[in-house]
Amino acid sequence: MPNKKTIRDIDLKGKRVLVRVDFNVPIDNQGNIEDDARIRAAIPTIEYLLDAKAIVILMSHLGRPKGFDEKYSLKPVAKRLSRYIHKDVVMAPDCIGKDMENIVKNAKSEDVIMLENLRFHKEEEECDEEFSKKLASLGEVYVSDAFGTCHRKHASVYCVPQILKPACMGFLLEKELLYFEKAMVNPQRPVVAFLGGAKVSSKLNVIKNLLKRVDKMFIGGAMAFTFIKAMRYDTGKSLVENDLIDVAKDIIDISKKLGVKFYLPVDFIVGKELSDNTPIKTVLWQEIPQDYMGLDIGPVSISLAKELIGTAQTIVWNGPMGAFEYERFKDGTLEVARAIAHSQALSIAGGGDTDHAIIRAGVINAIDFVSTGGGAFLELLEGKELPCISVLDDK
């Protein structure tokens, strides 16, 4: 883990602390927040800053607006946060400008200010220097607590911490990196990885990097069919990336050379199309009919996955085992989620739809750590250094 300063290392009393959080939460057309997990995840950092008598200035993006758009306002977020911290949150009209400077200048210790959506300004994603300087001028200390954006070189996460010093980690970012280190750098063995999702192409670097770090790997989801095709078996109408068949063969060979036990599903639930009304069958992996496609792992594969989970001391999970958003193809993903949650192993999960699957399985509080980052979590699994962490102050 990078040896970076945290908020524990900084004198915060009376200081204006500019905190980059990730409040990019789903909001419906009526302005209701559908899932506030990311807001709750930032509360330990915010409460620590308040206890330290700091002035807390929060900044985040929300969605992908093209300029100012009221439906992407952070007002509902400020309202929800104030409920959790039992304190008024001052909602700023913008994130830069004279009004902002006045609000910040008049703020007192233990005030909480929420800046308006950073992405109302295109300069945020361009890492514009002038925009970054204006943001940096609002604070005296910079705190990064937005793991989900740490792979992006945007102004608020990459440029501002190079201008505003000291620049340190909040508790959420620290926790993300600590759990990653426990699972991937100094793990209790055996380490078992479960990888799912639709495409090998999106997980190729993850698979290659994890093969160097894990003892066993189980590939589920539609990704499995490219590997089955690489073994010269028919996959019916299942999703296959034909341009990656040779790569899939290489991965199987690499796993053998590294002594990693490499598992594919042994049976599937197949249907004629992706819908809850399609005729379905349970078939062995080498018997998928021509006019059917694999849409979930089958009961024998679920048992195999549970057996692997039972052998693990550490589990890393990324990606669903099937089309779990459909009632008839949910069992593989949800059963694996529940088995991981009930195991004695240290479990970390994240990226893509994994968190949605865990919520649907009703085990969000039983997995040791569910990452708040999608792309950032995948980049860590790929072995990449996250640029927005490297710019923070070393201890």
Curated annotation (Swiss-Prot):
Pfam families: PGK. It catalyses: (2R)-3-phosphoglycerate + ATP = (2R)-3-phospho-glyceroyl phosphate + ADP. GO terms for cellular component: cytosol. Pathway: Carbohydrate degradation; glycolysis; pyruvate from D-glyceraldehyde 3-phosphate: step 2/5. One of its GO terms (biological process) is gluconeogenesis. Substrate binds at residues 22-24, 38, 61-64, 119, 152. One of its GO terms (molecular function) is phosphoglycerate kinase activity. Keywords: ATP-binding, Cytoplasm, Glycolysis, Kinase, Nucleotide-binding, Transferase. ATP binds at residues 203, 294, 325, 351-354. It is found in: Cytoplasm. Its main location: cytoplasm. Gene3D superfamilies: Phosphoglycerate kinase, N-terminal domain. Its EC number is 2.7.2.3. Monomer. Belongs to the phosphoglycerate kinase family. This is Phosphoglycerate kinase. It comes from Hydrogenobaculum sp. (strain Y04AAS1).
